[in-house]
């Protein structure tokens, strides 16, 4: 049965070491940590010399010398173990930007000593599955990010696609259309995470070169099937949410501008909403928890005050210039200690994928059995789905392999017999051709049927193997002796972690008891001793008083700062609202504005304003679809009318009330260009030659050339004289002169 018990959120604090940039700039370390007592003390660098340190106590604290594996074994191993038992679990890192949240969650996967919570949890989950017996597991992985209040799937092809949050009474809040991948090993789930990390939004600021610009959530769903006492399979589903939050930041320190500033604004708003949820959960007076203020708080609704076991890692920096952010982080973490969750085991959920897999495998096996086993095939022992055993499993596997071999041999043998039968028919000369053809066709038909049946069986067996390969079953690949040793080592680790926690609690209680004992003991041996004791008590009380006064002043300053930021945001929003109102008043008619405002409705699920339909539609859609006969037209049209419209211009057969009229073209005022028939150079030479010019005296030419030229001129002149008769009225043309011959 599902057990439900209240337990508080476990809060641990981790402080990173000083980096080279902080040391070079002369900043000092202001944080001191006592790992045994779980105590964190912070010194105010700007306070007066006598101001006491601010102290905070947590479940566990880790200083700058802590190791990744110690953090996992002492804090997170028990949580992952409970997820394997069917609980919901959440691990999230909280703190200022550049304090090591991503290093705590992911670390360096290539180095075993520097691996973070997520890679260590992968190893833990699949090692546990490999060592279990009589259980079936199905492991799925999803990866999403919240970037500027938009949910994106980091494993999808289109990362820019926005996903919506939905809520159901049985499962709670979930992301619609979020992709999920079935993984069978550490290597496969690490590949899924690598693909998601490559798609995640990362940027550079003055405080962090690889600053996460979005909140990322890696979701591991572990489904386990086990045979119960009643003989039925019972499924438990555990979900592990590994959350890497983007850090809160101030624009003055990060130097963010443009897109980085927009990202920082959205990050700070969502983290502010997370802080408000934590404050409301701790404050018993508040009846409303503002989960809907951001997408992050809605996704973490079960983790904060719901059905989950939660561990919060508060990361902080030790440098003096981060005093305000460090104090704010510690205060939020101190509040979160008082949040109470009610985790329960998720047994037999309706949407368990493992059950669907088992039912599908059972259906395929029944379909395979209906095909009928061959004569030589052995019938193995039937088992119920989910029932597994050590040696029996190995024997059953060998039997199944033997069955497959027998089936293949029987198929080959039947094919060989049919081939021999075909050869006998072909060799028989006494048969009539028609009878021989009929027998051959029957044999070929039987061959085809056997082949088809064999292919169907192979296809079903392939599907069964593919689906069974996704179900993880332990106790086969690892020797039982090694499993037992690993179990003992894990038990010892858990015992050591519990002993350390008990030791811290005992030291804390002893310290409180000592203080109470001194107060109760009122007997003193002398007046001097009484004065010393009371002076010491007075100093301690005065130090507490000063500490409380300092806390009150800090809270007032923080409240004033938050109020100033809210007022600034409010002024910006009012200015933007006024601008839009001026645009609406001057450019949108009053009637149209009234229509829109009366139809506007705010949808809390999508957090958007929607317009209600003008008329109530009975069906799912308001507008009716176009008829099939009117594709591309306003109204239906017959085939005859369509053909008539194509053949002629009769407006009767037109689908639209529009007449097709030819364009009325104006009279032409220009003419086409006609190029010259003779080249310009040749025409120029001809024009020059046809002009009347004096005879040219070419003295440089030889005598022979002059004589020939003179003879030619005489001949030409004589011809012209013969043509032109005296007393004729015919037009006289100019005579050719120069070097051009006519």
UniProtKB/Swiss-Prot annotation:
Keywords: ATP-binding, Coiled coil, Cytoplasm, Cytoskeleton, Microtubule, Motor protein, Nucleotide-binding. Residues 365-377, 411-425 have a biased composition (Basic and acidic residues). Residues 389-410 have a biased composition (Acidic residues). Heterotrimer of a 115 kDa subunit (KAP115) and two kinesin-like subunits of 95 kDa (KRP95) and 85 kDa (KRP85). It is found in: Cytoplasm, Cytoskeleton. It comes from Strongylocentrotus purpuratus (Purple sea urchin). Residues 365-425, 709-742 are annotated as: Disordered. Residues 8-339 form the Kinesin motor domain. SMART domains: KISc. The N-terminus is blocked. Residues 338-613 form a coiled coil. This is Kinesin-II 95 kDa subunit. Residues 709-723 have a biased composition (Basic residues). The gene is KRP95. Belongs to the TRAFAC class myosin-kinesin ATPase superfamily. Kinesin family. Kinesin II subfamily. InterPro entries: Kinesin-like_fam, Kinesin_motor_CS, Kinesin_motor_dom, Kinesin_motor_dom_sf, P-loop_NTPase. ATP binds at residues 95-102. Residues 614-742 are annotated as: Globular. It comes from the Eukaryota. One of its GO terms (biological process) is microtubule-based movement. The keyword Nucleotide-binding applies.
